[in-house]
Swiss-Prot record:
Annotated family: Belongs to the complex I subunit 2 family.
EC number: 7.1.1.-
Lineage: Bacteria, Pseudomonadati, Pseudomonadota, Gammaproteobacteria, Enterobacterales
Job of this protein: NDH-1 shuttles electrons from NADH, via FMN and iron-sulfur (Fe-S) centers, to quinones in the respiratory chain. The immediate electron acceptor for the enzyme in this species is believed to be ubiquinone. Couples the redox reaction to proton translocation (for every two electrons transferred, four hydrogen ions are translocated across the cytoplasmic membrane), and thus conserves the redox energy in a proton gradient.
Entry's localization field: Cell inner membrane
Pfam family, one: Proton_antipo_M
Name of the top EC class for this enzyme: translocase
UniProt protein name: NADH-quinone oxidoreductase subunit N
Highest taxon, organism lineage: Bacteria
GO biological process: ATP synthesis coupled electron transport
Membrane topology of the entry: Multi-pass membrane protein
Organism expressing this protein natively: Salmonella choleraesuis (strain SC-B67)
Subunit structure of this chain's protein: NDH-1 is composed of 13 different subunits. Subunits NuoA, H, J, K, L, M, N constitute the membrane sector of the complex.
Catalysed transformations (reactions): a quinone + NADH + 5 H(+)(in) = a quinol + NAD(+) + 4 H(+)(out)
């Protein structure tokens, strides 16, 4: 296949981030300068975001059999780039107090972003696997970046071993799918399944193994055991990336796979996914109830949020509303998580050992950092799905598609899970307004709102509130991505 200038335009975000990786690598070799390398990384990610406009002008097209660039890919590429940009922004003040190598952090985030963009554009199981590995391998280093702390190193080892096992399941599943269908392309798989091959035992076994591998990456029950330990052990900016960019990119490619290859048409697959969704919603929320560590709480919370999204994925073939639901929910989850983890990052910066992730550290925050406490409150309310926030719009969409498909047991799980979640999210919010302890612990800088990280947190809070009241711009953007598929 000949690569034309149109193809190069379509690949601009991938090429720009790839070029930024090379530039930052050479910059580190030439001169170790934290500010310079952080600036180069942020410029590269911003340039990749701007390039999406030119990609949109080029229109939808296949770039090699591995990738398809369309509205769907642009939407998820944009979300991954926003999450990566926020991660770099939160990392800069955190790394200012870090005495070991600082610059490699940005290099690893850029490489992981490259994997996320590849996943957003993937149209082939080979591209899916390459993207997942490209996003996972840098995370091994990022999670253990504060390697002098036992908890960070332990989290990195856990994630590395379990991620390798999950990748093995995923690869073996792909091998079985290829053995039965003779194809790895999403579209070709769709044709094979349409020819009545969906109920072949070998194919179902292959998809079953793939669900195990992808379930681990998405922290779905029962493949979730790594999540709270890794969220707690990883540095706060890394937890931000794990909770947002990594999950969004992988869920995006799973959604495309289900669109082209209607795996959900199999009753067996639908039942298995339904049970996983139900268990993730209930277990994630129940386990979060007793947590006193905010990062662990958000880790268990992410399990339940992916369970909610799985409800929309199960009914993906039934109409466009489920695609819309996933897009809106992921955008709400992105901004809410960026705000919540952003506050934790600001409270933990500069690096002084363990992060400020204990609930006790936030007790009485309102009385000396009122705006920061207000931001954290908005994020907790959005994650809980309270009306007038973007989180409510996403949860309402999920309930609507569940009702439309008559999945009453999953609708009940969403309602019960949301009620349970309300308790622990409000527990965090209420602690912000209690009397401050006699011996205050960690605190955010006095001028936090003027820092780049503070601006990102404030913008996230503003978007959560504005789009919660007036969601039409976001809904229109998500709808715009759908016809180009």
């Amino acid at each position: 296949m000949t690569i034309t200038p149109q193809h190069l335009i379509a690949l601009l975000p991938l090429l720009i981030v790839g070029l930024t990786v090379v530039v930052v690598m050479l910059s580190i070799a030439w001169r170790r300068n934290h500010f310079l390398n952080a600036t180069l990384s942020v410029i590269g990610l911003n340039a990749a975001l701007v390039s999406l406009w030119f990609v949109g002008q080029a229109g939808a097209m296949d770039v090699t059999p591995l990738m398809r660039v369309d509205g769907f890919a642009m939407l998820y590429t944009g979300l991954v780039l926003l999450a990566s940009l926020a991660t770099c922004t939160f990392a800069y003040p955190w790394l200012e107090g870090y005495n070991d190598n600082q610059e490699e952090f940005y290099l690893l985030v850029l490489i992981a972003s490259l994997g996320g963009i590849l996943l957003a554009n993937a149209n082939h199981l080979a591209a899916l696997f390459l993207g997942i590995e490209l996003i996972s391998l840098p995370l091994f280093g990022l999670i253990g970046y504060a390697f002098r702390q036992k908890r960070s190193l332990e989290a990195s080892i856990k994630y590395t071993i379990l991620s390798a096992a999950a990748s093995s399941f995923l690869l073996f599943g792909m091998a079985l799918v290829y053995a039965q269908s003779g194809n790895l392309s999403f579209e070709a798989l769709g044709k094979s399944l349409g020819d009545g091959m969906l109920h072949e035992p070998l194919l179902l076994a292959g998809f079953g193994l793939m669900i195990v591998g992808l379930g681990f990456k998405l922290s779905l029950v029962p493949f979730h055991l790594w999540t709270p330990d890794v969220y707690q052990g990883a540095p706060a900016p890394v937890s931000t990336f794990l909770a947002t960019a990594s999950k969004i990119a992988i869920f995006g490619v799973v959604m495309r796979l289900f669109l082209y290859a209607p795996v959900g048409d199999s009753e067996a697959v639908r039942v298995v996914l339904g049970i996983i969704a139900f268990a993730s919603i209930i277990f994630g929320n129940l386990m979060a109830l007793s947590q006193t560590n905010i990062k662990r709480l958000l880790g268990y919370s992410s399990i339940s949020h992916l369970g909610y999204l799985l409800v929309a994925l199960i009914v993906l073939q039934s109409g466009e509303m489920s695609m819309e639901a996933v897009g809106v929910y992921l955008a709400g989850y992105l901004f809410s998580s960026l705000g919540a983890f952003g506050v934790v990052s600001l409270m933990s910066s500069p690096f002084r050992g363990p992060d400020a992730d204990s609930l006790y550290s936030y007790r009485g925050l309102f009385w000396h950092r009122p705006v920061l406490a207000a931001v954290m409150t908005v994020m907790m309310l959005s994650l809980a799905g309270i009306p007038m926030t973007l989180g409510f719009i996403g949860k309402f969409y999920v309930l609507a598609v569940g009702v439309q498909a008559s999945l009453w047991w999953l609708v009940a799980a969403v309602v019960v899970g949301s009620a349970i979640g309300l308790y622990y999210y409000l527990r965090v919010a209420v602690s912000l307004y209690l009397h401050a302890p006699q011996q205050p612990g960690r605190d955010a800088p006095t001028n936090w709102q003027y820092s780049a990280g503070g601006i990102v947190v404030l913008i996230s809070a503003l978007l959560v509130l504005v789009l919660g009241v007036w969601p039409q711009p976001l809904i229109s953007l998500v709808q715009l991505a759908m016809p180009l598929m």
